[in-house]
Each structure stands twice: as structure tokens, then as C-alpha cells.
Regions:
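Catalytic palm subdomain of template-directed nucleic-acid polymerases
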Residues: 156-158
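Short, conserved phosphate-binding/catalytic loop or strand-edge motifs used
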Residues: 145-152
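Structured core elements
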Residues: 152-154, 263
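Active-site palm subdomain of RNA-directed nucleic acid polymerases
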Residues: 135-144
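C-terminal accessory/tail domains of diverse enzymes
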Residues: 2-111, 117-128, 135, 160, ...
């Protein structure tokens, strides 16, 4: 019987289209081969495995869409989709280079399991899958010093209104220190800059009581301070969905996927640890959503955080991640 905490329910139950909200889940790991991982996932969800190159597998049969298992290395994936006939010098050279790169990458590049957008109540199925993968030998960030593996959530927005988006940003920025402490991010991931915190100047701008920009200004401000995917809460997929040309003019990165979701990148993947699952990161994320839902409490938190950031002595004496707990307790 699992001793993990239950996955708490949503506050915002429906998406911007009025349907049940969905979420995409991405989990990085090592310790298993592409085919081994694909077969375990396929068996768990009763799916069919299709080969999509030497380093990618598509798992078909889920009404929500295709699951994907892939090596998280774009160059190798592109090479893996090319047929090697071996009847020319260039084919042989490419094959040799690919083999060398594959051998080197296996030491540091994770496999990634990517779900389709699934309804939130199916997260329990993902939690059960994590337990199976752990038993099968999957390894996460703390299993090897060089592992810098993450788990990412892509929850659909309950509304695409600019004010709602700003509320999510305000809530996340106010709770970032608390979330980061709770997540206990591995030093290797911190060094790699995959989940850099937001610049202090941007934080101060967003949490100001009069910061309620329209969509164009919101996106422009974000791009001015954050022209990168490497943020704990990456807004670029959502902003590309809303205004592709505006985003690509500043952050033209092929890895920015256009989708009406937030992209929460902070948590480590500690798959392989028996007590680990998606429950803690999910339940902590819901504190952001609860704060978004409660506008009056959000205003109070923003005001308190502004005061804290404006006083160096306060920052020296106290830690914001401890002070903000008082506001979280109001919802208990």
C-alpha cells in the first residue's frame, strides 16, 4: 500500500474553453533503455509502441493523445530519424559519429517520458507508473552526481485573460522561495541554469499593486527580462500560443512549444527513490493556484513581499520562504 500523500484536487477545474482542465507531465530519467521504458509505459496504459527513429518511441492508443519516450538530445533524435544504408563513405562516417555521440550522451543525457494533455484526475495513473518505473530500475537526479534531471508540469490555463495570467505570475513569484526550498533542488541542476529564478527587477515590477498590463505589454515585459526558456516557470509556450510573432522576434528557439499552458520546470526528478512521486510537487503547485483564486490574499502577499524586498535588514534577519507560510496558513 502506498504511503505517499494523496494528490490534492484543483481549485480551477475547467480550462479557458470550458472543458475539464488537462495537464501534461514530463519526467526525465536514466537507468532504462528507450525500448524498456516504452514497453513499461505501454503495458501500464495498454498502448501500442511505434518506432519514430532510433531514439524515439510513440505510444499510441490513449484517447488523450500519444505518449512519447525519447532521448532528450535534439541532434541525436534528428540523426536517429535518418536511414543509414551504409553504402557510402558519408553514411559510414555519419554512423560512426552517431555511435560515438550516443555513447557519450548516455552518460549525461536523460530519457524523457512525455504525456499527452491528460485530465487532472489521471495524475494518479502517472503516480502509479512512477512506482513501476522505480521498481524497474529507473534513476533520477540524486542517483548520480552528473544527473540534472527534472520533472515538469504543463497545466492548462483556466483563462487566457491577461489579468488571470498576471495573477499566476504574481502568485508564483511570491511563492518561489517557498517552492524552491520545498523542492530542495539538486546542486547539479542549479549549476546548469535550467531553472534560473526570475530577475529581481522583474519580480518587483510584477508584484507592484498597479501592474495589470494588457497582453502586448505583458509579453513585451516578460521578453525584456526573460528572453529564455530557463526559468522555473517558463511562460514562453503560453505567450507563443497567444502571439507567436511577438515571441519569436525575441526568443526564436525551436524548443519553445506553442500551447495554452504554463510550463512549471522547477521540481527535480527523483524517480528511483521509493518515497518519491509527483504528489509533493503537485500539491505544492496547488498553493500557487489557491493564491491566484483568492485575490484579496494575493494582494496582501504581494504587498508584504514588496516590503520585504525593499528592506535589506529585513532580508538579512528573516527568510521570505518562512514568512510567506503565514499567508499559506490562511487557506488551511
Amino acid at each position: 500500500m502506498s504511503t505517499k500523500s494523496p494528490l490534492k484536487p484543483l481549485v480551477f477545474t475547467h480550462n479557458f474553453e470550458g472543458n475539464k482542465r488537462r495537464i501534461g507531465v514530463e519526467i526525465e530519467m536514466s537507468g532504462l533503455g528507450v525500448d524498456e521504458l516504452a514497453q513499461i509505459v505501454a503495458k501500464h496504459f495498454n498502448l501500442t509502441v511505434k518506432t519514430d527513429g532510433r531514439y524515439e518511441r510513440l505510444l499510441k492508443g490513449d484517447a488523450a493523445g500519444d505518449w512519447k519516450v525519447e532521448l532528450d538530445f535534439d541532434l541525436l533524435k534528428r540523426w536517429g530519424r535518418q536511414e543509414r544504408l551504409g553504402d557510402s563513405f558519408m553514411d559510414e562516417l555519419d554512423a560512426s559519429l552517431e555511435k560515438t555521440l550516443k555513447t557519450l550522451s548516455e552518460q549525461i543525457v536523460p530519457l524523457e517520458l512525455v504525456s499527452p494533455p491528460i485530465e487532472m484526475d489521471r495524475l494518479v495513473e502517472v503516480e502509479s507508473l512512477v512506482e513501476q518505473l522505480t521498481k524497474a530500475g529507473a534513476e533520477g537526479t540524486s542517483d548520480r552526481w552528473r544527473n540534472a534531471f527534472g520533472m515538469q508540469f504543463n497545466p492548462e490555463m483556466p483563462s487566457l485573460d491577461s489579468q488571470m495570467i498576471v495573477r499566476f505570475l504574481k502568485a508564483f513569484l511570491c511563492l518561489y522561495d517557498w517552492l524552491e526550498k520545498r523542492a530542495d533542488i539538486n546542486l547539479t541542476r542549479k549549476i546548469t541554469s535550467y531553472v534560473d529564478p526570475f530577475p529581481r527587477a522583474y519580480v518587483l515590477k510584477v508584484i507592484a499593486p498597479d501592474y495589470w498590463p494588457n497582453q502586448d505589454q505583458l509579453i513585451d515585459d516578460y521578453l525584456s527580462y526573460n528572453p529564455t526558456r530557463n526559468r522555473a516557470l517558463d511562460m514562453l509556450p503560453l505567450f507563443r500560443f497567444l502571439d507567436e510573432s511577438r515571441v519569436l522576434a525575441i526568443a526564436d528557439d525551436v524548443l519553445i512549444k506553442s500551447r495554452p499552458t504554463l510550463h512549471y520546470r522547477l521540481p527535480d526528478s527523483e524517480i528511483g527513490q521509493p518515497s518519491w512521486g509527483i504528489h509533493q510537487a503537485w500539491n505544492d503547485w496547488l498553493e500557487v493556484e489557491k493564491l491566484v483564486f483568492d485575490s484579496a490574499r494575493l494582494d496582501r502577499v504581494c504587498e508584504a513581499y514588496q516590503i520585504f524586498l525593499a528592506h535589506p535588514i529585513e532580508r538579512f534577519v528573516n527568510n521570505w520562504d518562512e514568512l510567506v507560510v503565514t499567508f499559506l496558513a490562511e487557506d488551511r
